UniProtKB/Swiss-Prot annotation:
The keyword Nucleus applies. The gene is spb70. GO terms for biological process: DNA replication initiation; DNA replication, synthesis of primer; mitotic DNA replication initiation. This is DNA polymerase alpha subunit B. Accessory subunit of the DNA polymerase alpha complex (also known as the alpha DNA polymerase-primase complex) which plays an essential role in the initiation of DNA synthesis. During the S phase of the cell cycle, the DNA polymerase alpha complex (composed of a catalytic subunit pol1, an accessory subunit spb70/pol12 and two primase subunits, the catalytic subunit spp1/pri1 and the regulatory subunit spp2/pri2) is recruited to DNA at the replicative forks. It is found in: Nucleus; Chromosome. It comes from Schizosaccharomyces pombe (strain 972 / ATCC 24843) (Fission yeast). Pfam families: DNA_pol_E_B (PF04042), DPOA2_OB (PF22062). The lineage of its organism: Eukaryota, Fungi, Dikarya, Ascomycota, Taphrinomycotina.
Length: 574
């Protein structure tokens, strides 16, 4: 994406900033979007505004340089004489060499300063439907939540690293076939009218295929000259052809995206796109009048309140799990009907777990370490809690996505805990939730190519890709090259990541990107942020869902949930 700049003076400022910060124009545009989001609006792109943006970019760069120098100072060592310590000679406190064992011991005092919950805990950072007034009265009896799993848990218990090429290719091909059928149904065309994009055509035709990067280098990125369209085996024998998007007024594409395109291939070597045909979304969930009456009775016609939080749950220099203690303490002081906690709990990338320098434990396995340190903290919860793993969870024996659920019994968790897979869709009374902890938002933001997209907001656009593609992780081959946040896709089982028959009412996508909560095409979409980043406590989300008020629905016995109209969503400081 390029800045629409006509002013020569503004153009000079942009070029200077590109040179100073050593970045390309698309990266700068992403930073501009982020800068606008932090201000809660979309500032006009003029000289004064851009200078303010440039000032912030320079300040951030200087701060990063200073932090790097502070972490790696140039030290001139003095050869030590055996038996002599210069500090003791000068009367200074003697510092012992920091080993892996002492690292944890030295860091413990710093974590105690959190005192579980600071005075800042619970401060509202962002809110959706702020104007919504939800009246809560003291119920005569506690709310009874009906939690229904909309997935087959046994299907997630597959053997990893046993992928067969044929099975993987079938899954990828079936995705194109699915969207081919949807295109025919939406635009009232027959299956025979779908064309092979690699065949020579002078007249406009409709084709369906997968966006692929043309690159000989591992980790190549999309640009206007490297877009390929891969057809299905039935319609085009899986052949890939160059896709030209120069004539499109707007687009937003990424590798793995299934698209329906109208255009022609006059040369036989390149398909020239004239229009990208939108695919109709899935319908929203609905409930019968009888089901609704049951839900109202279970909740005493009171709103449902839910906390949602995502790991990592330990600071970077210890395994005392201070953020998790803070979260559980906050929940106990401010009770809700349900808590949804996402991993990683024992982060495989944590320095102490990665190096094995874990002290003060009798555990002989990572599962036992979870039982010893995490389970006692979680057991303090008295309300229902749903645990969803992350592929970086060291206590999980299933480090591939789609990912099997935790074993509640093996981890010693009490009966008020439910362990769901990653991803999952489930219902809480009349509200359908969708959750995936694989960081599709971050990975797509690094691979996306766009021009004047329909969603100007970055977060809304990334979420819309998930909704339109009907899949929790539509990116392919995915963020497999990410060092600390890989995708670890098991291609043969990607069908487990597809949406079922309906859209979720609420979509939860934890990400390393900045927290947010938005109404994206009538789906309440949120990233609760991380419980901790480095040595600081992070954020979590709170949902307050008012009961559905039934109106006149004509002759129909089913009612749309309309969750986006009756949900107040907040991002809170931990």
């Amino acid at each position: 994406m390029e800045f629409p700049i006509d002013d020569e003076e503004l153009l000079d400022e942009r070029n200077k900033l590109l040179q100073i910060c050593n970045m390309d124009e698309q990266t700068m545009f992403y930073k501009w979007e982020s800068w606008c989001l932090q201000r809660g609006n979309t500032p006009k792109l003029d000289l004064d505004t851009f200078k303010a943006f440039a000032k912030d970019m320079k300040f951030q760069m200087e701060r990063q340089v200073k932090a790097t120098l502070k972490q790696n100072p140039e030290r001139k060592s003095i050869k030590q004489i055996p038996g002599m310590n210069i500090d003791s000679i000068l009367g200074l406190p003697v510092k012992t060499t920091a080993s892996g064992d002492s690292l944890m011991q030295e860091s413990k005092p710093s974590t105690e300063t959190f005192e579980l919950n600071s005075s800042d805990a619970g401060r509202v950072l962002e809110v959706l439907n702020k104007e919504l007034k939800i009246v809560t009265s003291k119920p005569s009896a506690p709310s009874k939540l009906v939690i229904v799993a909309n997935f087959d848990l046994k299907a997630f218990n597959y053997r990893i690293m046993y992928q067969k090429l044929y099975d993987s290719s079938e899954v990828l091909d079936d995705r194109i076939e699915l969207f081919s059928a949807l295109t025919c149904r939406k635009y009232n065309i027959s299956d025979e009218d779908l064309a092979n994009p690699s065949e020579l055509t002078q007249e406009p035709v409709v084709v369906v295929g997968r966006i692929v990067v043309e690159s000989t280098n591992l980790g190549g990125r999309l640009n206007q000259n490297s877009i390929l369209l891969e057809s299905s085996r039935r319609l085009g024998a899986g052949v890939r052809v160059r896709l030209k998007v120069d004539d499109l007024p707007s687009y937003s594409i990424f590798p793995g995206q299934i698209v329906s395109v109208k255009g022609s291939n006059p040369s036989g070597n390149m398909f020239i796109a004239k229009e990208i045909l939108p695919i109709p979304p899935l319908p929203f969930p609905s409930s019968s009048k009888q089901e609704h009456a049951t839900f109202v009775a279970n909740t005493n016609n009171q709103p449902i309140s839910i906390y949602i939080a995502s790991g990592p749950w330990s600071l970077r220099d210890d395994l005392s799990f201070s953020p998790l203690k803070s979260m559980i303490s906050y929940v106990n002081k401010n009770p809700v009907d349900l808590v949804i906690l996402c991993g990683p709990f024992l982060d495989i990338n944590h320095i102490l777990i990665r190096t094995g320098n874990i002290t003060g434990t009798s555990a002989t396995s990572l599962e036992e370490l979870f039982k010893e340190r995490v389970t006692p903290i979680l057991s303090q919860l008295t309300c229902p809690c749903i645990l969803i793993p992350h592929i970086n969870d060291a206590a999980s024996d299933h480090p591939a996505w789609p990912q099997d659920a935790f074993n509640r019994v093996a981890l010693g968790l009490p009966s008020n805990f439910k362990c769901f897979p990653n991803p999952c869709m489930f219902s809480i009374n009349d509200v359908v939730f969708g959750v995936s902890t694989n960081d599709i938002l971050l990975h797509t933001s690094r691979e996306e190519l766009f021009r004047l997209p329909s969603h100007g907001n970055l977060f809304a656009r990334l979420v819309s890709h998930v909704l339109h593609q009907r899949h929790f992780y539509p990116l392919f081959p995915g963020g497999s090259l990410e060092k600390c946040n890989p995708s670890n896709l098991d291609i043969a089982h990607l069908k487990l990541g597809e949406f079922l028959n309906t859209m979720p009412d609420i979509l939860i996508l934890p990400s390393d990107l900045r927290y947010f909560v938005k109404n994206v095409e009538n789906v309440v979409s949120l990233n609760p942020g991380k419980a901790t980043k480095g040595i600081n406590l992070g954020t979590f989300a709170k949902l307050t869902i008012a009961p559905l008020e039934l109106g006149d629905n004509g002759s129909s016995n089913h009612y749309s949930h309309r969750v986006w109209l009756r949900t107040k969503a907040e991002i809170l400081k931990l």
